[in-house]
Amino acid sequence: MSTDHHHHDHDAHDEIPFDEKLLKLLGHWIKHNEDHALNYRKWAEKAKANGRSNAAGLLEEAADMSLTINEKFEAALDRLHRK
């Protein structure tokens, strides 16, 4: 009897096609970054209200960076849709 009796791939039948998975991930990442950007901006306002304008400015920059990353994700989505 062979000791290598369990070598088949369990995921072979359940795997999502690559393009579909990538589209879903990009959509998720875009939403995720939007949520983070909103949260960073809320905390920037709180930081300003508490005399921490220097930190607030950095939080605003982080929010902007998150949305800039989304531009790349949106471009990737566009290219995937064009195939």
How would you describe each model-predicted region?
Residues 29, 62-65, 69:
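Amphipathic alpha-helix face/heptad-repeat signature
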Residues 7, 78-83:
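Short, charged, intrinsically disordered terminal tails
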Residues 56-61:
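Short, charged, amphipathic alpha-helical segments
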Residues 31-35, 62, 81:
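Aromatic-residue detector
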